[in-house]
């Protein structure tokens, strides 16, 4: 079967202290796995990348209590093709943007640490978007988007300027008990970050709702429960572009 195209699946490179209980944050397991599976099942090739070519999973995201049946099956089966794709993760500076029709950015609080400063990933996102590609992100993954320039904007604005977007919001941070951990590190909540970038931030009904926003070629989702729907929405947008 011919490939539908190629997706660049982005993970944070950060793995380190964050949670009040002493556990480390990293890329969220389900937010990397589920989009990978959605894209593969739809016939896309998937290349994993991070700024440094390395990633580790958020400690909380791989606790047994956090894994649903699909995630548990993949986590326990190291012959699952996801693990082979993970071994082939490449640093962002080794990626050719011309190969990709979709960039999908996974979350986890780790994204807050490195994606705002991940200049090689930001450049790739800028190039893919300028080439009529789709930028999709879920949970904390959207944190990178305000730092991605829209090259077609004469004012040098970001790709989310004037766009409706969503992400893990300030209410969610309160529910998780990590608002103070963000403040201690001078990290803005995503509501504030997007509004400063000129985007229209759309809050979900609840922090745990499966909720996405699509505005042009920008696709965003709120949380791990939205990983599947966000990836599916990105596919729908990308396929619609072929027909125009």
Swiss-Prot record:
InterPro entries referenced in this protein's UniProt entry, alphabetically: Class_I_gatase-like (IPR029062), DJ-1/PfpI (IPR002818), Prot/Nucl_acid_deglycase (IPR050325)
Keyword ATP-binding: no
Domain of life of the native organism: Eukaryota
EC number: 4.2.1.130
Subcellular compartments: Cytoplasm; Nucleus
Transmembrane portions of the chain: none
GO molecular function, one term: glyoxalase III activity
Annotated active site: 139-140, 173
Pfam families assigned to the protein according to its UniProt record, in alphabetical order: DJ-1_PfpI (PF01965)
Keywords per UniProt: Cytoplasm, Lyase, Nucleus, Stress response
Principal subcellular localization: cytoplasm
Catalysed conversion reaction: methylglyoxal + H2O = (R)-lactate + H(+)
BP GO terms, sorted: cellular detoxification; methylglyoxal catabolic process to D-lactate via S-lactoyl-glutathione
EC top class named in words: lyase
GO cellular component: cytoplasm; cytosol; nucleus
Main function: Catalyzes the conversion of methylglyoxal (MG) to D-lactate in a single glutathione (GSH)-independent step. May play a role in detoxifying endogenously produced glyoxals. Involved in protection against reactive oxygen species (ROS).
UniProt family annotation: Belongs to the peptidase C56 family. HSP31-like subfamily.
Protein name, as recorded: Glutathione-independent glyoxalase hsp3101
Taxonomic lineage of the native organism: Eukaryota, Fungi, Dikarya, Ascomycota, Taphrinomycotina
């Amino acid at each position: 079967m011919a490939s539908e195209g190629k997706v660049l699946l982005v993970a944070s490179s950060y793995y380190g202290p964050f949670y009040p209980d002493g556990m480390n944050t990293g890329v969220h397991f389900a937010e990397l796995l589920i989009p990978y599976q959605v894209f593969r099942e739809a016939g896309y090739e998937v290349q994993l990348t991070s700024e440094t070519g390395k990633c580790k999973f958020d400690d909380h995201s791989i606790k047994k209590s956090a894994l649903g049946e699909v995630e548990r099956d993949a986590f326990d089966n190291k012959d699952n093709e996801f693990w082979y794709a993970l071994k082939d993760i490449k640093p962002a500076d080794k990626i050719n943007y011309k190969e990709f029709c979709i960039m999908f950015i996974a979350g986890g609080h780790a994204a807050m640490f490195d994606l705002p400063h991940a200049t090689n990933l930001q450049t790739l996102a800028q190039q893919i978007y300028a080439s009529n590609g789709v930028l999709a992100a879920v949970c904390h993954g959207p944190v990178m988007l305000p730092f991605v320039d829209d090259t077609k904007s004469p004012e040098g604005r970001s790709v989310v300027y004037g766009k409706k977007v969503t992400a893990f919001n300030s209410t969610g941070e309160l529910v998780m008990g990590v608002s103070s951990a963000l403040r201690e590190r001078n990290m803005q909540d995503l509501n504030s970050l997007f509004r400063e970038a000129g985007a229209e931030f759309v809050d979900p009904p609840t922090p745990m709702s499966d909720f996405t926003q699509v505005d042009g070629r920008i696709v965003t989702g709120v949380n791990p429960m939205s990983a599947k729907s966000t990836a599916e929405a990105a596919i729908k947008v990308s396929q619609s572009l072929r027909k125009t």
